[in-house]
Each structure stands twice: as C-alpha cells, then as structure tokens.
Amino acid sequence: MVMRFLRYHDAMSKTHAALQARLREAALAYLDRYESSVQSVRRTLRRRIERWAMKDGTPAEEGSIAAIEAVIEDLKRTGLIDDARYAGVKARSLFNSGRSGRAIGAYLAARGVEPAVIGDALESRTDDAENYQEPDLDAARRYARKKRLGPHRPPEQRAEKRDRDMAALGRAGFSWSIARSVVDEEM
C-alpha cells in the first residue's frame, strides 16, 4: 500500500514538474515578445493550459493553478516580470503618445496592476521631462496635434469644429478646462 502511494506521488510530482517546465517555456516565450504585467502573464498561462487540455481531450489538471503560481513567483524572483517596471514604462509610452492620466490609469488597471503602483507610475511619467506644471495639458496638446484638433485644423474650420474637438478630447479622458485651453490655443 505504501509503495503504491509512493509510486503515485512520484508520478504526480514528475507530471507537475513537467507542467511547470512547459508553463515556464510558454511564459518566457510570451515575455520575450511583450513586456507584461503579472496578471497578463497569469491569464496567458491559463489560456495556454485550457488550449493544451482541449487539444489532448482531457480536463485541465487541478494542480495547474499551483503550477502557474509557482512559475509566476519564479519569474518575479528573477525579475523577469515586475508590475512597477511595466507600469512605469507603459505610462511614459502612453503619455508620450498623448493619453490622459485617467486613460493611462484605466489601461493599467485593466491589465491587473495594483492602484498604488498605478499612482506611482502616473507620478513618474513626467520625471524625464523638465518641470511639467500640467502633464495632462501637454498630453492633450500631443493628442490634438496627432488628431489634427483645435489649433492644428485649417483656420477656416476651427470655429465650426470647436465643439466636436472638445468632445473628442473629453472622450480621450481630458477635463473640460484642459480641452478648452487646448482647442482655443493659437499656434
């Protein structure tokens, strides 16, 4: 009886180790292509397990969640995934492309980044720049230039498209006062 238990336990630990090795390879391949949050890696690995289970025609193993968590902890320990680093890089990138602070926060929250980490990332998004008084105002200007809104429209269209331009900035997550100041700016 004891021998049968030991053989079963040994087989299960080998299966668990093999699953962990496959998951680690999948996670490394994913991280090789994308900088990612912990939650995104977790979702990707769960989808991978479901796909493997469907392909094999077997249900997903009970130990698969534990294997995913073990792989994620190992990746965190080695520094391959770090939510703070991911949030900082993504916040700067989105800020430089003209996204508002509100839109950046929503984007990061949707990817499972903790609110405290999001706050730190939003604070650090302008560290590279010199003395930003209003980072959202600068982002709104970038957005307006990119979308040809407000002062970037032909002069004959500015007055008739003013409300539409303000609405576009509002939908992008900018406040009414920032939208108004950007749309009414002179080039």
Model-found features: residue ranges?
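An alpha-helical, amphipathic repeat domain used for nucleic-acid recognition
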Residues: V2-M187
